[in-house]
From Swiss-Prot:
Listed name of the protein: Glycine--tRNA ligase
Traits of the deletion mutant: RNAi-mediated knockdown results in larval lethality. RNAi-mediated knockdown in the germline results in 100% sterility at 25 degrees Celsius.
Record organism: Caenorhabditis elegans
Gene Ontology cellular-component terms listed: axon; cytoplasm; extracellular region; mitochondrion
Subunit structure: Homodimer.
A single GO BP: diadenosine tetraphosphate biosynthetic process
Localization terms from the record: Cytoplasm; Cell projection, Axon; Secreted; Secreted, Extracellular exosome
Keyword Heme found: no
Length: 742
């Protein structure tokens, strides 16, 4: 019986091997840029021999982070390994002959080896990404560093150096062009100090919190969900952990986003998790509000907070913005500014910080019509969507056209889908690797009760999938909350096809009697009565008639009203417009997180020289567009240098002159390291013709061309703006072969 089963299974497995070989899963021919003056050479790539720990790291990475294409290739191999693992257990349980078990073990080992080799061959470079080398580069070249470092530093606060500051500024400039200018948005710049009543109305005072646990002996604090995640991942990587415990841990990780304090306490207790620093017991999770409190003015009575998001400044200015837009919907407002969150335990560099730059859009739209004319322009654009259904079913993310996703109601509406597509375009434009970008839908227990749909743009880094952009349909919640708190209507008018007669019922307060009965609370009661809908007033009237008493709840306090406290007014009015509270579609961008992901995705190592690292930014966002390098300090080159600088300045191209005494190769390496995409070399051949000529070197490929200085500014400008690619320049201008190795 075993022999027959083994034979059939082996035949199927042989087909798998032939399939993967034919698809070049293991053997590829690629052209590798040489570091020396040698042409590109074909090189056979095979799965390298990694040590066991590294192979396991790659396998674990692919189980969590594989793209749909990679997962489709690995799934049958994993199933083949599982098949023989189950078969061996079954043979042992039935007391099968040792020779049959040994045959099965040999086959299982072969299948495991094929799976491991395939994982290594298919694994993207980031699976074995060396974060320490990137961090060394960023710190050494001062892209950013911990704030107040000479005083010991403060976790969660960072200062950007010249390169980091310029990179960030270029990203923000491109964001402003991509959204505010192209979409005709209204830009505002609101204060970071926010009075407590504003954030009380928005819900931040009561609900903007994370669950925190403390070391019971020394009081050290940890964010509960992060502690659980890190502890479970440690268990999963421990060979001594049983299969049942690993499965339990994986189930917890899949549901962790929706856990409350009770769920987290149950997990910490069940797995017996301790403090990762001391091993001490932990307290039960408690809520920790993430806002920084402060006071406005000298008395300390005016409570305020540093804003946790920029959105509230737009909401409270809605009436002014609507007026500026001639009262028309839809329209979008945008703001670029700082947000502040008092994180419990900031980790992972720029990914989790206490002060950060946000770019937020609030798109106000008719809640009954969220269609968008411009959606047709992006309907065919494909995005990798990780829907809530796929998450719950354990299925991988899928590449889907956004038009199809909206048509099937996977994405709630056209406006939300449009901003997701535009988000994808922006991230690709600044240099995010499209293979490491997906949109994950919030599960129902993750979303706020008022939200209708939410998709996070997540970028894959060495820390895992990181939420960098939130795209949410917030419905009418925020404007309604601020109306309730201020009694200022935040509505738009929608013209009706034909005038209609509408019956109104209002509760008018008897302020004289309310003042006698309720003193200072009379005004608050009057405001609450004014905010009642016609249906609520009718219910109030019925209760007053039946019981001669009505309990009105305001801010959690009840007030007993009698018929004498108010008058019920009924009337009919012909209306030509309908007042509506707009829904809000909100894309929210965390610039620091996108910037860190970009740094990882742009990090490179020279082939054959792993110590020679550099950053390959897209010219559009590169901190400095080109370097200017004289081949020597000879004074005869000065006129050419001056002409080059004048030409670059004419086209507003940033440049860095490096006229130090090092070799040209060493200077190339220095400028490559900080992400300068183009190097302009002034050599003695530059003087041989009139007008002067120079060479331009492309940092990533190290190829060079020669052209006249008069053409330099236009070419660099076109390369930066994307009007030309480097391949276009190579086709137009003569190739330059360096006379010395770099």
């Amino acid at each position: 019986m075993f022999s027959s089963c083994w034979l059939k299974s082996s035949v199927r497995y042989s087909r798998l091997i032939r399939q993967f070989s034919s698809e070049n899963s293991f053997f590829k021919v690629e052209l590798v840029p040489s570091d020396r003056k040698t042409p590109l050479q074909p090189r056979k790539v095979v799965a390298p021999r990694f040590e066991k720990k590294t192979r396991q790291k790659i396998s674990d990475y692919l189980k969590q982070m594989a793209t749909p294409e990679i997962e489709a290739k690995l799934a049958p191999l994993r199933a083949a390994v599982k098949e023989y693992g189950d078969l061996i257990r079954d043979l042992k349980a039935k007391g099968a002959p040792k020779i049959d078990i040994d045959k099965a073990v040999v086959e299982l080992k072969a299948r495991k080896r094929l799976l491991e080799d395939t994982e290594i061959a298919l694994a993207p470079k980031e699976a074995s990404f060396d974060r320490l080398k990137l961090e060394d580069l960023l710190k050494r070249r001062f892209f950013y560093d911990q704030s107040f470092a000479i005083y010991g530093g403060v976790t969660g606060l960072y200062d950007f150096g010249p390169m980091g500051c310029s990179l960030k500024a270029n990203m923000l400039q491109e964001w402003r062009k991509h959204f505010i200018l192209e979409e005709g948005m209204l830009e505002v710049d609101c204060t970071s100090l926010t009075p407590e009543p504003v954030l009380k109305a928005s819900g931040h005072v009561d609900r903007f919190a994370d669950w925190m646990v403390k070391d019971m002996k020394n009081g050290e604090c940890f964010r509960a969900d992060h502690l659980i995640k890190n502890s479970i991942e440690k268990l999963l990587n421990d060979k001594k952990t049983s299969a049942a415990v690993k499965q339990d841990g994986q189930d917890v990780l899949a549901r962790l986003e929706g856990f409350d304090n009770k769920d987290m306490h149950e997990v910490i207790t069940r797995f017996n998790f301790k403090s990762p620093i001391t091993g001490n017991d932990l307290t039960e999770p408690i809520a920790f509000n993430l806002m920084f409190p402060t006071q406005i003015g000298p008395t300390g009575d005016f409570k305020a907070f540093l804003r946790p998001e920029t959105a509230q400044g737009i909401f409270v200015n809605f009436k002014r913005l609507l007026e500026f837009n001639q009262g028309k919907l839809p329209f979008a407002a945008a703001q670029i500014g700082l947000g502040f969150r008092n994180e419990i335990s900031p980790r992972q560099g720029l990914i989790r910080v206490r002060e950060f730059t946000m770019c937020e859009i609030e798109h106000f739209v008719d809640p009954e019509d969220k269609s968008l004319a411009k959606f047709a322009k992006v309907a065919d654009q494909k995005l990798v969507l990780f829907s809530a259904c796929n998450q719950l079913d354990g299925a991988p993310a899928q590449e889907v056209a956004i038009g199809e996703a909206v048509a099937k109601k996977t994405v709630a509406n056209e406006t939300l889908g449009y901003y997701m597509a535009r988000c994808h375009q922006f991230l690709m434009k600044v240099g995010i690797d499209g293979r490491r970008l997906r949109f994950r839908q919030h599960l129902s227990n993750e979303m706020a009760h008022y939200a209708q749909d939410c998709w996070d743009a997540e970028i894959l880094t060495s820390y895992g999938w990181i939420e960098c952009v939130g795209n949410a349909d917030r419905a009418c919640y925020d404007l309604q909350q601020h109306y309730k708190a201020t009694n200022v209507k935040l509505v738009a008018e929608k013209k009706l096809p034909e005038p209609v007669d509408v019956n109104f019922v209002e509760a008018q307060a008897n302020m004289a009697l309310l003042g006698k009965s309720f003193k200072k609370d009379a005004k608050k009661i009057q405001t609450s009565l004014q905010q009642l809908t016609s249906e609520q007033v009718s219910a109030l009237e019925e209760e007053l008639l039946a019981k001669k008493l009505y309990n009105l709840s305001v801010d959690g306090q009840n007030y007993a009203l009698t018929p004498e406290h108010l008058n019920i007014k009924k009337y009919t009015k012909k209306i030509h417009v309908q007042e509506i509270t707009p829904s809000v579609i909100e894309p929210s961008y965390g610039i620091g997180r996108i910037m860190y992901a970009l740094l990882e995705h742009s990090f490179r190592q020279r082939e054959g020289d792993e110590q020679r690292t550099f950053l390959a930014f897209k010219p559009l966002v590169a901190p400095i567009k080109c370097s200017v390098l004289p081949i020597s300090a000879n004074d005869t080159l000065i006129p050419v240098m001056d002409a080059v600088k004048e030409e670059l300045s004419r086209f507003e191209m940033s440049y860095k002159v490096d006229d130090s005494s090092g070799t040209i190769g060493r200077r190339y390496a220095r400028t490559d390291e900080i992400g300068i995409p183009f190097g302009i070399t002034v050599d003695f051949d530059s003087l041989k013709t009139t007008p002067f000529t120079v060479t331009i070197r492309h940092a990533e490929t190290m190829s060079q061309i020669r052209l006249e200085v008069s053409e330099l500014g236009r070419l660099i400008s076109d390369l930066v703006a994307g009007r030309q690619q480097w391949s276009d320049a190579q086709a137009k201008y003569p190739k330059f072969e360096a006379s010395a190795t770099e």
